[in-house]
């Protein structure tokens, strides 16, 4: 099931967006080791500027442009799970020995139905270890619109939003319960409701007792 998409231009657009959870991404950083960050969207200047302060390998892979997200596939197009995993793996095109510390998923999960999301998570698995954490954005329910934005991270508690430059792809709702089931090895350890109905998620492997899986709404 899809839900209503937001208009491409918003009368109340505000570029800066406060985050209560983005700072958690940096709590496990070890200053003597290189940080590997995967950003699923296009390279945004705020993200580049922030991570320039770290010993960091910053990888931008804009998966929003994948044909799989267009919703225009033929009705008889039914790839297997493994074929979808292989397509995502090819799109990621990561070196075999890559281990990611931080995944910036932004609102990418909202553009994948359950089948695609499972395949994407499986394709990412070889590059994940016990310390990997992630950040994502969603909507609380189908009555909330998902704005057509792109994102960067400006500082530890502030994101920067950019108006989307292309027509918004089809959007699919995922409740927090469904999302937890679809994310496999990732757990939603913390979630916060934003004033406009969006939700931010902090994801981890669930191996660290200091992160408690307790939604606040």
Which residues does each predicted region cover?
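Class I (Rossmann-like) S-adenosyl-L-methionine-dependent methyltransferase catalytic domain
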Residues: 1-29, 34-37, 44-92, 133-217
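Local beta-strand N-terminus motif with an aromatic residue
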Residues: 34, 99-100
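Gly/Ser/Thr-rich loops at beta-strand to alpha-helix junctions
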Residues: 43-45, 110-111
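Residues at alpha-helix caps and immediate loop-helix transition turns in enzyme cores, especially N-
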Residues: 47, 116-117
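A short SAM/SAH-binding and catalytic strip from SAM-dependent methyltransferases
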Residues: 100-116
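A short glycine-rich, Lys/Arg-flanked "PGG" loop and its adjoining helix->strand segment in the class I
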Residues: 118-133
């Amino acid at each position: 099931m899809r839900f209503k998409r937001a208009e491409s231009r918003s009368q109340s657009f505000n570029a800066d967006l406060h985050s209560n959870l983005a700072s958690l991404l940096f709590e496990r950083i070890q200053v003597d080791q290189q940080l590997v960050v995967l950003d699923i969207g296009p390279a945004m200047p705020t993200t580049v500027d922030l991570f320039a302060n770290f010993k960091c390998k910053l990888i931008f892979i804009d998966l929003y442009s994948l044909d799989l997200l267009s919703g225009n596939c033929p009705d008889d197009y039914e790839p297997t799970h493994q074929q979808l995993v292989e397509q995502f793996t090819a799109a990621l095109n990561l070196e075999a020995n890559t281990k990611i510390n931080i995944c910036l998923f932004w609102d990418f999960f909202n553009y994948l139905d359950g089948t695609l999301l499972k395949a994407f998570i499986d394709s990412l698995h070889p590059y994940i270890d016990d310390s990997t954490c992630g950040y994502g954005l969603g909507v609380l329910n189908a009555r909330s619109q998902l704005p057509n934005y792109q994102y960067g991270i400006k500082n530890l508690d502030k994101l920067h939003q950019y108006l989307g430059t292309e027509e918004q792809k089809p959007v699919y709702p995922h409740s927090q319960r469904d999302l937890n089931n679809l994310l496999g090895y990732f757990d939603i350890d913390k979630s916060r409701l934003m004033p406009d109905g969006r939700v931010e998620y902090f994801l981890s492997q669930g191996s660290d007792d200091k992160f408690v899986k307790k939604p606040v709404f």
